[in-house]
C-alpha cells in the first residue's frame, strides 16, 4: 500500500521510552508534536537482520537529532521483550543503550494500518516512513525480510525534504546535502540540464 501524500495513521500503544521506561499509552501524534519523524518497522526482536538495523539506527541517532527528527521503531513484540532485547544488545557490548522509542504492536493493528504486514508470517516488513511536520507521509521504503535498509539513504531523504521545505526547489536524481536543487520553471530545468551536460 502506497501512503505517500496521505496523513500518517495515528496510534496509541505501549512502548519503551529512550530511557527504558514503559509507557502504557504512547501516542504517536502527541510524541511527534509537529516535528519531522521517521517511523520504521522491523519483524521481530531476537532475530537476525533486525539487530543490525537497530544498532545502525542507534549509531546514527545524533544525526537524526541534529536534523530535529523524531525516531520511532515498531514491532509486534511486547514491551517486556523490547526491554529484554535492549538489555541483551547492551550486555553483549554491541551498543551502550538504545536511545529511541520502541513501540509494541502486539495486536498488529499499527502495521496493518500502514499496509506493511507480511502476508504469510503476520510480522511487519522492513518499512520506513518519512513523515513531515504536518504529519504527511513524504517518502516510504519497504524491504522484504532478508534485506536490511540503508540508514544513510534515510538521512539523505530527510535532507531532501528539509531542503524542499526551505527553498521550494525540487531535488534531482542523486541529490545530496550541499547540492543545488531545481527551480520548478522552464528556466530552472534548462539551467540544471545545461549544468549536468558540462560534467
From Swiss-Prot:
Q: Give the family from UniProt.
A: Belongs to the peroxiredoxin family. AhpC/Prx1 subfamily.
This molecule's function is given as: Thiol-specific peroxidase that catalyzes the reduction of hydrogen peroxide and organic hydroperoxides to water and alcohols, respectively. Plays a role in cell protection against oxidative stress by detoxifying peroxides.
Show the CDD domains listed in the entry.
PRX_Typ2cys (cd03015)
| Assembly | Homodimer; disulfide-linked, upon oxidation. 5 homodimers assemble to form a ring-like decamer.
The record's subcellular locations are: Cytoplasm
Please give the catalytic activity noted in the UniProt record: a hydroperoxide + NADH + H(+) = an alcohol + NAD(+) + H2O
Residues of the active site are 50
What other remark does the UniProt record contain for this protein? Answer: The active site is a conserved redox-active cysteine residue, the peroxidatic cysteine (C(P)), which makes the nucleophilic attack on the peroxide substrate. The peroxide oxidizes the C(P)-SH to cysteine sulfenic acid (C(P)-SOH), which then reacts with another cysteine residue, the resolving cysteine (C(R)), to form a disulfide bridge. The disulfide is subsequently reduced by an appropriate electron donor to complete the catalytic cycle. In this typical 2-Cys peroxiredoxin, C(R) is provided by the other dimeric subunit to form an intersubunit disulfide.
- Domain Thioredoxin span(s) in chain numbering: 2-163
Q: Name the PANTHER family for this protein.
A: THIOREDOXIN PEROXIDASE, THIOREDOXIN-DEPENDENT PEROXIDE REDUCTASE, MITOCHONDRIAL
**Name of this chain's protein:** Alkyl hydroperoxide reductase C
Q: Where does the UniProt entry say this protein principally localizes? A: cytoplasm
GO molecular function list: NADH-dependent peroxiredoxin activity; thioredoxin peroxidase activity
Q: Which Gene3D superfamilies match?
A: Glutaredoxin
Q: Which UniProt keywords apply?
A: Antioxidant, Cytoplasm, Disulfide bond, Oxidoreductase, Peroxidase, Redox-active center
Q: Name one GO cellular component term.
A: cytosol
Q: Which EC numbers does the record give?
A: 1.11.1.26
Q: Which organism is it from?
A: Buchnera aphidicola subsp. Baizongia pistaciae (strain Bp)
Matching InterPro entries, A to Z?
AhpC/TSA (IPR000866), Peroxiredoxin (IPR050217), Peroxiredoxin_AhpC-typ (IPR024706), Peroxiredoxin_C (IPR019479), Thioredoxin-like_sf (IPR036249), Thioredoxin_domain (IPR013766)
Q: Name one GO biological process term.
A: hydrogen peroxide catabolic process
Amino acid at each position: 500500500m502506497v501512503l505517500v501524500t496521505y496523513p500518517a495513521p495515528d496510534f496509541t500503544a505501549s512502548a519503551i521510552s529512550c530511557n527504558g521506561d514503559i509507557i502504557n499509552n504512547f501516542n504517536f501524534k502527541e510524541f511527534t508534536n509537529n516535528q519531522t519523524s521517521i517511523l520504521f518497522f522491523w519483524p521481530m526482536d531476537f532475530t537476525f537482520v533486525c539487530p543490525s538495523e537497530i544498532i545502525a539506527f542507534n549509531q546514527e541517532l545524533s544525526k537524526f537529532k541534529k536534523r530535529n527528527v523524531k525516531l520511532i521503531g515498531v514491532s509486534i513484540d511486547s514491551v517486556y521483550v523490547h526491554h529484554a532485547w535492549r538489555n541483551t544488545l547492551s550486555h553483549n557490548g554491541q551498543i551502550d543503550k538504545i536511545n529511541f522509542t520502541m513501540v509494541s504492536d502486539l495486536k498488529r493493528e499499527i502495521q496493518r494500518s500502514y499496509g506493511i504486514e507480511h502476508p504469510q508470517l503476520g510480522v511487519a516488513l522492513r518499512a520506513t516512513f518519512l513523515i513531515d511536520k504536518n504529519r504527511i507521509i513524504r517518502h516510504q521504503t519497504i524491504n522484504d525480510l532478508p534485506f536490511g535498509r540503508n540508514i544513510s539513504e534515510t538521512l539523505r531523504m530527510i535532507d531532501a525534504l528539509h531542503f524542499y521545505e526551505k527553498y521550494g526547489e525540487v531535488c534531482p536524481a542523486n541529490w545530496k546535502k550541499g547540492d543545488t536543487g531545481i527551480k520548478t520553471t522552464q528556466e530552472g530545468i534548462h539551467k540544471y540540464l545545461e549544468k549536468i551536460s558540462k560534467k
